[in-house]
Amino acid sequence: MLLPAVVLALISGATGLALAMHYPLGPAVMTALVLAAWGAFFAWPQLWLLLVPALLPIIGLAPWTGWITFEEVDILILVVAASGYARMAWPVRTNTTGDGSSRDAMPGMSGVSVLAWLLALLFAASTLVAVGRGFADAGGFSFGWFQGYLEPMNSVRLGKSIFLALLVLPLWQSAVRQQPERAQRLLAWGLMLGLAGAAMATVWERTAFTGLLNFSTDYRT
């Protein structure tokens, strides 16, 4: 077992489960979906490359949940991380190499240069400083599930993306090392599906509010 992978799996799983249990629209249903997704992503570790970019434009339900600090995509990425790092901690032996040799389905986290990691960590550190400044300007940190844009948790909303990206970066490296062509193909399909979903949502929104071909009425998509 890799201790860092175990720790990341536990933290990601616990955080994702906590968000699911406090989800405003049916916490029991969301918790059940999280548990099912854990199993799916553990069984098919590259599935997230298709689903995350495909679902990203269409799973934001903030108008109905009232959440802006936390989003459905946060839960999805935390589930991906929990399953991926669990598989990395308890690797499954598979034959994926061209010569038939066996290797771990989830190898280590290497593959990115020290300079690249240093730059990423420096950017993450600068984000933490910015989040701290945001807390200070909002009158100090106070936690709340339904805070708005002028309250402390808005800094968390703005700063979390870099940390979610860094969280899944080793999983992307692992997928590319195992089956580079398949990983890139799944990601490409996911991006295309996400673009199609965003385009359809835009067409629906304009049709619903102004009319698809009405370019005279003031409206911001």
Feature locations, PLM:
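Membrane-interfacial helix-loop-helix modules of multi-pass inner-membrane proteins that assemble, modify
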Residues: 62-63, 127-152, 182-184, 196-221
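Alpha-helical transmembrane segments of polytopic membrane proteins
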Residues: 2-6, 22-34, 68-79, 150-163, ...
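Interfacial loop-to-transmembrane-helix boundary motif in multi-pass membrane proteins
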Residues: 48-49, 102, 107-123, 162, ...
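N-terminal hydrophobic segments of proteins, predominantly signal-anchor/transmembrane helices
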Residues: 39-159
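Hydrophobic alpha-helical transmembrane segments
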Residues: 19-28, 135-139
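Transmembrane alpha-helical segments
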Residues: 34, 38, 78-85, 164-176, ...
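Short, amphipathic, aromatic/basic-enriched membrane-interface segments that mark the entry/exit
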Residues: 1-2, 16-25, 41-45
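Alpha-helical transmembrane segments
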Residues: 2-15, 33, 45-57, 117-122, ...
